[in-house]
Structure formats: structure tokens, C-alpha cells
Amino acid sequence: MPANKKHSRRIDRTKAFQVLYSLHFTQINTIETLKEIFLNLPNPLEERNTGIITELDTQISFSWQLVEGVWRNVTRLDKIISQFSQNWRVDRLGKIELTLLRIATFEMYYCPDVPPKVSLNEALELATCFGDEKARKFINGILDAIIKAIETEKINYIDKN
């Protein structure tokens, strides 16, 4: 993957994290409200370089795919996460950790073009930015277990339909 695309995807994940994290503090019942929150959140790339229109368009689409996908599949994602978070109920996880786990798990199951190890590494990078070392280790353990289950075909990609 070219460095520019990798950088853009990290920004996408950052925006998705910010939107999805904010949902812990507000009730969203419609896709329209979710879109409004998404579009009103400042774009990290705009703050750095307002002249890159094509990258902004790309970022919006991948960021939105993550936000909408996690929002629509949160129950499924939480069920998967709970299978691998030994002795931890999903409702007891920290909001940062849970949000990062949901994004990475969504990518692992619904984005076959993204290698699971990339999803794990990106979640760890975001955990470094938004969490602490303890959170990073916790996220690594759960996502690593999910990857091993995918690799041994104990669990499969989820049909999007």
C-alpha cells in the first residue's frame, strides 16, 4: 500500500474513532443523525491541508464506511468481542478500548481487502494516541485472538447482506 494511502487510512480511522467514541455520550436513532454528526466533525486532513480535495473525498468514503458499518453492526461486533474478552463483559470495557475494538473487528469481518494484522496494528496506533499502555496491551490480546480464530477458520468473514 502506498504511504499516502496508508496515511489517509489512518486519518480515516481517526475520524471514525472520534465519531464512534462520541456515540457513547449521545443516543443516535437514525442514519441521518449519524451522518450529521459525521459531517460536522472537523476533518483532520482539512486542518493540515485544505487544498487536497480528492483525498478528502476518499477519506469521507472510508471513514463513513467504518462509522456506518460499526453503527449498523454494533450488536454483532460486541458479540464477537465478548467471545474473546475473557472475564470481561462488553459493557464493562472502557469506552476508548471498546470503540477501537469495534472498529478493528468490523474491518476484520467486513473488509476482506484490509488484512487483519493491519486492522490490529492500526488499532494499536490509535490506542497509543487515545489510550494508555494498559489499553494497548488489552486491545492487542483480544484482536490477536480474533485473528487467530480467523486464520484457523474457526470464524469467518460475515456476509454483508
From Swiss-Prot:
Gene Ontology MF: a single term: RNA binding
Matches recorded under SUPFAM superfamilies: NusB-like (SSF48013)
GO cellular component: cytosol
Function: Involved in transcription antitermination. Required for transcription of ribosomal RNA (rRNA) genes. Binds specifically to the boxA antiterminator sequence of the ribosomal RNA (rrn) operons.
Biological process according to GO: DNA-templated transcription termination; transcription antitermination
Keywords associated with the record: RNA-binding, Transcription, Transcription antitermination, Transcription regulation
Listed InterPro entries: NusB-like_sf, NusB_fam, NusB_RsmB_TIM44
Entry similarity comment: Belongs to the NusB family.
UniProt-listed Gene3D superfamilies: NusB-like (1.10.940.10)
Coiled coil regions in record: none
Leader peptide range in chain numbering: none
Highest taxon of source: Bacteria
UniProt-recorded name of the protein: Transcription antitermination protein NusB
PANTHER family: ANTITERMINATION NUSB DOMAIN-CONTAINING PROTEIN, N UTILIZATION SUBSTANCE PROTEIN B-RELATED
TM segment ranges: none
